[in-house]
Amino acid sequence: MKPLSLLAALVASVMSCASLAAEPIVIKFSHVVANDTPKGKAADYFKKRAEALTRGKVRVEVYPNSTLYKDKEEMEALQIGAVQMLAPSLAKFGPLGVKEFEVFDLPFIFDGYDDLHKVTQGPIGRGLLDKLSARGITGLAYWDNGFKSFSANRPLTSPADLRGLKMRIQSSKVLDAEMRALGALPQVMAFSEVYQALQTGVVDGTENPISNLYTQKMHEVQKHLTLTEHGYLGYALITNKKFWDGLPADVRGQLELAVKEATTYANFIAKQENDDALDKVRKSGKTAIYAPGPAERLAFKKALLKVHEKMDDRVGMDLVQSIYKETGFDPAKL
């Protein structure tokens, strides 16, 4: 090869390598809810901060509302590397084989956000995230959504009112036991299918934080909503472990900061978003809203406490007891 030709080839090679080096790292972030939910807003905030902090080295593509993968598909997509990040509900990890996460599904185990954050922001929560590593997943943080309430097409003022109702749940042995303890018939169903199922009568009711109920327009096909706040629905922000470990150290550090900022934002707005959604449901006039008094809420607690005992072996008695100790919950005082 002539010297000039060799020089030209070397220059072209260097330019090609530089071009490849300049290509941003793409993070596909799939989720199943609307953009204007706590998770949807947090995902968009993470995108904004990740791209800013890495100065364009990372591009985050957010796919909301099951536009890329449905509820039951996204975990496998993450494990095979088809997407890089998810924020699935905590109930999703039980079917994955990490049954301890179903402790978050236990009814009334948390009496509000203060109790919850003692767990999710402490060593118990970190220890649970670390259990995902064996599944090829790195757990990054917990994102709040809110506390769930029951909805149906008939009034639900006592535990007995749920008897015989077909209630949609996520795939969770704990949630299955919860509904059966109330005499309801649990129906596992993907989140994206719930509105149509309620509309057509395939299921009679569901349990959701109010932001999910409102943004998915479920209030349009549910005549009654009872503010039981009986259970928590939150998310774990997770990533493919091989992808995360393979990132350049500086980029990973910048993304860790973006995760921290997005988590603070997510958990700050969660309660506000649910309060705003409740106000919008009320103003819509489509759904009658019932707020149980202390005695009525206690009746729901007593009816559902047996689920804790039944699920001890599944989620781990030591784990349940450690949460009781952390939050000060004492079932004997009910």
Task: Set out the residue ranges of the language-model regions.
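Bacterial N-terminal signal peptides that target proteins for export
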Residues: 1-7
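N-terminal signal peptide c-region/cleavage motif recognized by signal peptidases
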Residues: 16-19
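N-terminal secretory/targeting leader peptides
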Residues: 22-115, 123-334
